[in-house]
Amino acid sequence: MAPKKKIVKKNKGDINEMTIIVEDSPLNKLNALNGLLEGGNGLSCISSELTDASYGPNLLEGLSKMRQENFLCDLVIGTKTKSFDVHKSVMASCSEYFYNILKKDPSIQRVDLNDISPLGLATVIAYAYTGKLTLSLYTIGSIISAAVYLQIHTLVKMCSDFLIREMSVENCMYVVNIAETYSLKNAKAAAQKFIRDNFLEFAESDQFMKLTFEQINELLIDDDLQLPSEIVAFQIAMKWLEFDQKRVKYAADLLSNIRFGTISAQDLVNYVQSVPRMMQDADCHRLLVDAMNYHLLPYHQNTLQSRRTRIRGGCRVLVTVGGRPGLTEKSLSRDILYRDPENGWSKLTEMPAKSFNQCVAVMDGFLYVAGGEDQNDARNQAKHAVSNFCRYDPRFNTWIHLASMNQKRTHFSLSVFNGLVYAAGGRNAEGSLASLECYVPSTNQWQPKTPLEVARCCHASAVADGRVLVTGGYIANAYSRSVCAYDPASDSWQELPNLSTPRGWHCAVTLSDRVYVMGGSQLGPRGERVDVLTVECYSPATGQWSYAAPLQVGVSTAGVSALHGRAYLVGGWNEGEKKYKKCIQCFSPELNEWTEDDELPEATVGVSCCTLSMPNNVTRESRASSVSSVPVSI
């Protein structure tokens, strides 16, 4: 017998060291030839995402072709007269309505939509498969109805945008009706604005006479309705009422939207009283009588203010009053300027008399101008202080002289609170004043109130937290840091924390319930006057002062007003340059920064500034021919 061969066992380590040869795939060979071996030192591999721009359109085209051939369609959508074969996945991908019902029951084979027109549904299905559609004012009603019902939001937006784009005088009410029916907020807002802006032309169209009472009532109540005058609004309302005798019952309610108080007494007689209905209908006649009484009682107009005395389409603008222009001994100014948002500064009117270092206030839509100086005498300004007090009405471009202040005042402050006007401190030929007096419009009288603890002038005041804050100024021949607050409810004064920097001839303004003190001058180390650039802010909530961004240009005897949440500091005298300034500096409390705005037409000191609601340009132009702009006294 032959001996058995001895089998030699290889250990585990020997097996691991064996080389296993695997034939390269064609791809690996190709990569190797180009040096693209993984982990090697060949060319680097960078992956990129590529997009086929034609893939989406091709996919839609393929799906649309499949639907036309009824290939793989798995859902039938029916209307009262017609059915459509579609793919569930396509309809569910663009319609929340189909997505929800198919998610509940994916096996559903048919959906009947009897409230949707075949035309509307066919257009929606075509849009789902192509992303395209043809719209017209004749078909959009059925299409948007289907799109809203099926919750296809992109299609609803396309329809809304189409309505806005195609807006005209002839179809604007049609757009309003569709927008209201299907809750298209953007389209409705656009249509309403279009009608407001083109109301005169719209009132001549056939669509206007078809308005319901609710629709014309909503238009005539609108503050932003663009009209040349309120007389035109009255005539348009009467035109609608007289078109159908059945509308007579709406006369008083509809005409209550006419701003009769903004029509002059002469025009009320000429154009309103001459209309028979205004004399025969008791409720309509009462509207006329109320307007007449409003004009006959000028001192009571503050308490008679209402929606019917407020101008339409008013625009809040910056207004400057008086001052001394130029670097020479030029006469004082009577001019009142306003800044049109589009056209810049223009002359609004003239004051009854020239004025310098006067104070202004706005209350109930009226501009009040008080005190100041009537002569240019730099050596003795207090000698020429006056007690004049007058009121400007921007609706009619007219002035009335009111009761003079009890004391002549210049370099004082004027504040408005709770329907009353407060004049504090200042100086005149007799010296600095501590007195405080309050103007009551209904009686046209000034009433003395508790005086300041010490006489002060060249200060600034602002209203916050129900109190009048009086800041800084000139006390006992020295610049002051002191601050005190007057409480009209208790007719008492309270000391508040001082300013960090003494100042006089400065400004104060309220922004977002905080008082900002800016500008003015103080004495430098050598006893010379220097500009104060620091700006301080008082918070009634904490009762403390803090710093805000400093001024870029120091100014004294400037004017300041708040507009759209910002402070505008205009004109003034710069001590560093010894120069009158025409700059307008704008402060944003949100950004805590100052920026240069446009300039005044002329460098001016002793100028006052306020914000006033003005009629729009069309109204201003039309009233000039019917209402005198010459100052009058009543």
From Swiss-Prot:
GO terms for biological process: negative regulation of JNK cascade; negative regulation of protein phosphorylation. InterPro entries: BACK, BTB-kelch_protein, BTB/POZ_dom, BTB_POZ_KLHL31, Kelch-typ_b-propeller, Kelch_1, SKP1/BTB/POZ_sf. SMART domains: BACK, BTB, Kelch. Transmembrane segments: none annotated. Keywords: Kelch repeat, Methylation, Repeat, Repressor, Transcription, Transcription regulation. Strongly expressed in skeletal muscle and weakly in heart. According to PubMed:15302408, not expressed in other tissues. According to PubMed:18719355, abundantly expressed in both embryonic skeletal and heart tissues. Residues 172-273 form the BACK domain. Transcriptional repressor in MAPK/JNK signaling pathway to regulate cellular functions. Overexpression inhibits the transcriptional activities of both the TPA-response element (TRE) and serum response element (SRE). This is Kelch-like protein 31. It comes from Homo sapiens. The gene is KLHL31.
